[in-house]
Amino acid sequence: GKPVVWTMHDMWPCTGICHYARECTNYQQECHNCPYIYKGGSKKDLSYRTFRKKQKLYSNAPVHFVTCSRWLKEQAQVSRLFEGKSVINIPNAINTNLFKPQNKEEARAKCMLPQNKKLILFGSVKITDKRKGAEYLIEACKLLAEKHPEWKESLGVVVFGNQSQQLQEQIPFHVYPLPYIKNEHEVVNIYNAVDLFVIPSL
C-alpha cells in the first residue's frame, strides 16, 4: 500500500525481459515472440509471461517511475505496462566539488599520458557494447586520419573500460587503453587530462 518511487537505469521495468529493446517495439503493446530469445521465442515465451506478471504487479501498486534521461522517459511512456503511471525525468546529479577543471599537465602525469599530444577520450564499462557506439568512433577517426594525415603523430585517443585494448588495431591514431575505472578521483584525472570527450552512444 505504501507509495513506491522506482528509479530506472534501463528499460527492464517497462519491457518483458530485456534491458534495452533496441529495434523491438513489442513492449509498447505486449511482449511475445522475443527477438532476443533463442529462435525468436514464441507466443507465450518468457518475455510474454514476465510482461503479464509485471502488468499484474503494477496494476494496483502506487508506483512512480523516475528516469535518468529524457530518452528513457520517452521509451517508458509508450509501454503498455506504464499506462496510467507517473513517469518523470530527474537527471543524475554531478558533484561539482569533485568534477571540476584542474591542471591538465598534472592530470596527464597522474594518468601516465603524453604531454605533447592532443588527446580524445572515449569511455564505457565495456568498450565492445554496441550501444556505446565504438564503431562510429572508429569510423570518425579513420575519416579524420584521411583528411588530416599530418595529425597522425600529434593526436592520440584515450580509451577507458573493459576490453579497451581491442581498439588499438582499429583506430589509425595512437591509442592509450586504460581499464574500467570505478574510482571517481581517477575518472576526474582522466577527464582533465584530455582535450576532447567523445560520446558516440546510440
Model-found features: residue ranges?
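Charged active-site motifs of nucleotide-sugar-dependent glycosyltransferases
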Residues: 63-64, 86, 113-121, 155-156, ...
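Active-site proximal beta-strand in glycosyltransferases
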Residues: 2-38, 64-66
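A short, active-site helix/loop in glycosyltransferases that binds the activated sugar's phosphate group
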Residues: 15-19, 41-89, 94-106
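Conserved donor-binding/catalytic core segment of Leloir-type glycosyltransferases
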Residues: 113-132, 138-142
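Short hydrophobic "strand-cap" motifs at the C-terminus of beta-strands
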Residues: 68, 90-93, 122-126, 160, ...
